[in-house]
Amino acid sequence: MTTNTVSRKVAWLRVVTLAVAAFIFNTTEFVPVGLLSDIAQSFHMQTAQVGIMLTIYAWVVALMSLPFMLMTSQVERRKLLICLFVVFIASHVLSFLSWSFTVLVISRIGVAFAHAIFWSITASLAIRMAPAGKRAQALSLIATGTALAMVLGLPLGRIVGQYFGWRMTFFAIGIGALITLLCLIKLLPLLPSEHSGSLKSLPLLFRRPALMSIYLLTVVVVTAHYTAYSYIEPFVQNIAGFSANFATALLLLLGGAGIIGSVIFGKLGNQYASALVSTAIALLLVCLALLLPAANSEIHLGVLSIFWGIAMMIIGLGMQVKVLALAPDATDVAMALFSGIFNIGIGAGALVGNQVSLHLSMSMIGYVGTVPAFAALIWSIIIFRRWPVTLEEQTQ
């Protein structure tokens, strides 16, 4: 059975299963944001000290995305997915059993290894397995899985951690991954590597200034976002003085707003992708600047989180669409680079938030985040004027 002869129903089932996998991988990456206080309490540490776990995870992904992708470039994709899921599940069992913070960090590094490979191949696999003429919808489903990780995954993970302990959150993610793995084994055909690219692809990609500019924009804007977002849970409780339940609700609201951003991008992205991304970066800048002033009211923080969530979803979708459009001949290499660069931004933002919290005040995370956000806004305006046609290739 090949991907060309299967029924549309089976083809969609494969894409949906990949979207569920995307949901699980994004949930485990983001869920520590909602568990920092609980993990810190468990190991008798400061919240800011535990936060370094976010940076380690993100930078391992950043460092290993391209090497792992190149090492596995000729490996049949079904076998590769099964292997990385086994590593992913085993690492979550270790997270559940963690008897020290060091062991927890080691388990997260194992998850990061699996993550590094998964995100470099997922978009291209979704396109390959989609029914004829439905590639855009397949990518949209993967993006929906990503969005739902913010909408449901992170808040549910926090709720489980709140009532059953943070270890159970990681255990539940491992169980979800096991079920998904069984579905993948049943549904996926043999998937020989295609358009994976190689080291020979790198000089070609590096000679594309529009693509390199998108990568730079990605790392700067993601740094801005994660400077504040990494510590939003302790910020809400310790700086704003609101309850743990409100922190959970706020994470749910911020994630849910991402669905609105996805709908907006779906309707307007084909014609106005560049303008949407620049507008979203400007909106992120405003949200970060108003984070501390909004902390005096639950309503103000709630409204701010809605706009924040919308902005980040539009930015994330816009960056991914442009990368895929600018490197159709080496999608796996381009997406491995994108995943690595995105995670450099996550790690940098979490580290900046960590240092601000330790040496200045956690109340300052929003203000500090405005610096890279402003730089990203200026850069986006420059590059979208410099390469207006190239960056809109995906609309043709």
From Swiss-Prot:
Any GO MF annotation of the entry: carbohydrate transmembrane transporter activity
Protein's job:
Involved in the efflux of sugars. The physiological role may be the reduction of the intracellular concentration of toxic sugars or sugar metabolites.
Q: Does the keyword Ribonucleoprotein apply?
A: no
As for membrane topology, the entry says: Multi-pass membrane protein
Major location, coarse class?
membrane
Q: Which residues cross the membrane?
A: 15-35, 50-70, 81-101, 103-123, 136-156, 170-190, 209-229, 246-266, 275-295, 299-319, 333-353, 364-384
UniProt source species? Escherichia coli O157:H7 (strain EC4115 / EHEC)
Q: What is this protein called?
A: Probable sugar efflux transporter
- Pfam families, alphabetized: MFS_1
**Got a GO cellular component term for this one?**
plasma membrane
